[in-house]
Amino acid sequence: KRRGYTPQPLRRVHIRKRNGKLRPLGIPTMKDRAMQALYLMALAPVAETTADANSYGFRKERSTADAVQQCFNDLARTTSPQWILEGDIKGCFDHISHEWLLDNIPMDKVLLRKWLKSGFIFNKQLFPTEEGTPQGGIISPTLANMTLDGLEKLLADSFPINRSKKNYYTPMINLVRYADDFIITGESKELLENHVKPLVIEFLQARGLTLSEEKTKITHIEE
């Protein structure tokens, strides 16, 4: 039970990324971290039942090595797809739609809203949070995963394999995702550019997210 529980504003800190830019983190209080951990114990098993099969980040018994192995499995054969869409989501954690989370995450909505709207303190000033789930929150990785889950099924449903003996055809669509980084394979550059990418953009827009035009690219595996 909530029993009048109200989370405190997050403490904003910045860490430097490899490219020299700063990544903002929102650090909850110890009490808020404990409450998030408690609710995560109930939410995590639910998240596992709806997770994409080839999602590897922030999941028990999965690692970057597993994601790399799956990429190898998808691309190593002579009959494997030759083209890859490398997806980069702009500030994924910072821009997830609060409305989407409140409509789709199966947990106490009042408490989830309080966590999302708790704001953060920086330089002794309180700032509101209108979107996103803070990097630094214990429950945030699972919320981000649940936001992005469903893309693999959408791609499979949109680009089915024709298994007819006379007209066998496969678009060679495979998704491998680690947290907010992902690749999608395809039989041609045109398929990825004209059909797959617009579908991904639409999927992300519904969740308040966008692809980075600068960092998202389509490449041949030999490049």
Region roles according to the model:
Residues 41, 45-57:
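Charged boundary/loop elements
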Residues 24-27:
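Conserved phosphate-binding loops in nucleotide/dinucleotide-binding enzymes
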Residues 3-4, 9, 53-54, 66-223:
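Conserved polymerase palm-domain catalytic core
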Residues 2-5, 20, 43-48, 76:
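Generic short alpha-helical segment signal, independent of protein family or function
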Residues 19-20, 124:
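Detector for glycine-centered tight turns/loop "hinges" at secondary-structure junctions
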Residues 34-43, 143-144:
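Active/ligand-binding-proximal structured segments within catalytic/core domains
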Residues 60-64:
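Active-site beta-loop-alpha junctions of metal-dependent nucleic acid enzymes
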